[in-house]
Amino acid sequence: MFRAIAIIRAHEVIDAVPASHIVLERDERHLRRKAITLENGEKILADFAEPVVLEHGDRLVLDDGREIEIRAASEELYEIRGRDPRHIAELAWHIGNRHLAAQIETDRIFILRDHVIRVMLEGLGATVTDVVAIFSPLRGAYSGGHQHHHGHDHDHHHPDHE
C-alpha cells in the first residue's frame, strides 16, 4: 500500500493532472493516519506526524511521487441568513455558543442540518434554507499552534505567556 507523505495545498498546485482523486466529507478531511480508498479502487495510507485538515483542491503526495486530489463532498446543510450584518453576527454567536462547525460568509452562514438548531435559529428571526453544498467550516481556536489536551488541569504555568 502506498503512503501519502506530504500535502500540496490547493493554492500551490501546479497544473499537473492528478493520478486519481478522493471525495471526502468535512469530518473525513480531518485525519492523521487513515486508510483511504481512491476513486479507482486503490487503497493508500495517509500517514502524517500530526493531524491535518484537507481542503477542496489540496493534493496528497504519495511515496511514489503521484498526486491524489482531494475533493470535498457535497453535504446536507442549512444556509442561514439574517436581516442585516448585526443580526448575522448575533446568529453566528448563538451557533458558536453551541460549538457547532460553521462556514461564515459575509451575508450567510452554513451549518450541518440539525432540526433542533433550525427551530432555534428561526425563533431568533433567521431565514433557514436547506441546501446541498461543499462544507468548509472555520477551524477552531485549537486547530493549530499551542493546543491544550483536555485530559488534564489547566492550573499550570506557561513561561512564554506570563
UniProtKB/Swiss-Prot annotation:
The keyword S-adenosyl-L-methionine does not apply. GO terms for cellular component: cytoplasm. GO terms for biological process: protein folding; protein-containing complex assembly; urea metabolic process. Keywords: Chaperone, Cytoplasm, Nickel, Nickel insertion, Virulence. It comes from Brucella suis biovar 1 (strain 1330). Disruption phenotype: Disrupting the ure1 operon causes loss of urease activity, decreased resistance to low pH killing in vitro and decreased pathogen survival when inoculated in BALB/c mice by gavage. This is Urease accessory protein UreE 1. Residues 143-162 are annotated as: Disordered. GO terms for molecular function: nickel cation binding; unfolded protein binding. Its main location: cytoplasm. It is found in: Cytoplasm. Residues 152-162 have a biased composition (Basic and acidic residues). CDD domains: UreE. Involved in urease metallocenter assembly. Binds nickel. Probably functions as a nickel donor during metallocenter assembly. It holds the Pfam family UreE_C. The keyword Cytoplasm applies.
